[in-house]
Amino acid sequence: GSRIYGTVPIGIIIGEEAIITVSTQEVKLLNDFIKMRVKGFHTAKKTRIILQIMYKNATYYLFYLKQIDRLSESIQKELHKSMKNEELLQLLSLEKSLVYFTTSLKANEDEKEKMMRLDVIKQYSDDKDLLEDVIIENKQAIDMSQTYGNILNGTMGVVGSIISNNLNIVMKVLTSLTIILAIPTIVASFMGMNVPVPLADNPLGFWTIILITIVITAAFTRFMLKKKL
């Protein structure tokens, strides 16, 4: 089925003696800190905690962006075999996910810049490298999200063109078949008129008319095939 990768907003409240994080649901990112899975994590260093949250957040974005890219490649391979609605809906879901990712990452970039300008956030020389890593990781995530989004958008456009082209081909074939099948009907209707018609008294007239009908139908079919109609 279709799968959408979403984002969850996290609020960070900076107090005199504590940092409080708020989210609408349980977040794996924060659990990494709670379970002490983050290297160099110290609750006494507020600035570092904020930077570490931002860095960890960017790495998670990169991780899921790579997942989206792999899933997109897999779906596109399936589309080469047979174009089903399920695969198209999956691509649409991934495209929506990338829109959410790009929007959230850009918002994070803006918030990071605002946060670093606040007087309440003390900046230490030891955290300079970590801040640079945060900037690099977040920028890389934004670039990846936009690139994958553009590729997926282009893919959806190509798929739409292929579907439209296939529909036109089917309509052409059906129209051609309708015209070809109409030829015997027209001949039969003409010969069935209550007026004198050629070959009416000929004992081989019926078979002659059948042969003429077949020849006309075959000639018209060949003409349409030659013109690729």
Positions of PLM-derived features:
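A generic membrane alpha-helix/interface feature
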Residues: 34-35, 41, 127, 203, ...
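Long amphipathic alpha-helical coiled-coil segments
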Residues: 115-128, 154-164
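Peripheral, non-transmembrane regulatory/ligand-interaction domains of membrane transport proteins
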Residues: 1-118, 123-124, 133, 137-140, ...
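Hydrophobic alpha-helical transmembrane segments and their immediately adjacent juxtamembrane loops
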Residues: 139-229
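Alpha-helical membrane-protein architecture signal
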Residues: 50, 87-90, 127, 156, ...
